Amino acid sequence: MGRLLSGFADCICCGRGNRYQSADAWMNQPLNIFQPRSTATLEDLLEKSSRAREAVWQQLGSLEPLVLSHLVSPTLSGGPKWPALRQAFRLVRRPNGNVILASDGLSDPFDDITLGDGNVNGFGLEFYIETPGNEIAETIHDVKKSWQFQLLYTVSQLAAGHGGIRAIMDDMKLLSTEAEGVNEAIAEEHRKALVNGAGRVGALLGLQSPQDSSSASADKEADSTGVPERIPDMPLTEVKLVNIKLLTLAELKLITDRGAEGRKRLSELFAGPERLVSSLHRPSAV
């Protein structure tokens, strides 16, 4: 995980000159940077945050009632701490046949601030990956073994370990990373096109539905195929929904060679209704 965190920091800074000599500088910002205002109890805020997230997913499809979580939080065994300790994931089956896997807890209020006054909605984001339904298992148990879940889990842990990803995303719009621990879940016949020599896969973070760039209202941003950019009605601070897009090695090389310009170019190349979808079977955009 240490190598992954270092690689992520290097990746998000590429193409920006000396402005981002250390991505960790963002972590020195005060917790109440968004100037929240609330005197609700932590329990109230956790419940309101959970309901707001559920409302978004229910708008996009059929939300599985069973939450994907751990019997024992990875935090207790030395993993990154999520805002309220709880680490969970949700599964949504969409009318178009796709499936969404999403983190559920990165935007919980911090549990070490008992009152809402001065608290924020965690790291200010939740990640999701959308994939064709025929490329992922049917049962929750098998879903947790899928490459889609492993990629989502790795990126979520990465963000929790860093702590300041939201501020960087607000400034840079698109980030990219190379994720470990995903390659073994990918069918062997697809690894040559997706897994690099270090055993990692590339991912682009932050693609939005085409209508998001021009829509002023979060609750109008989702349509039959799109996912909203933000979660409405969070109790403390704004929370973004961040797409994870699996990259081919050729696409990852474009980013490695050209940095921020490469990420922007890929965003332009990923068009149409499959823009946000990750699949082992799609042709490379480059």
What is each of the regions a protein language model found here?
Residues P30-L46, E126-D142, E251:
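Charged, low-complexity surface segments at secondary-structure and domain boundaries
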Residues P132-R166:
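Compact, glycine/acidic-enriched structural inserts
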Residues G2-D10:
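Short hydrophobic helices that act as membrane-entry/anchoring signals
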Residues D10, C14-A84:
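The feature captures two recurrent sequence modes
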Residues A40, D44-E47, R51, S146, ...:
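Alpha-helix boundary/N-cap detector
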Residues I12-G15, A159, P273:
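Short, flexible helical or helix-coil boundary motifs
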Residues S62, G78-T131, A167-S284:
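Aromatic/basic-lined ligand-recognition segments
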Residues L4, G17-Y20, L276:
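Positively charged, low-complexity intrinsically disordered regions
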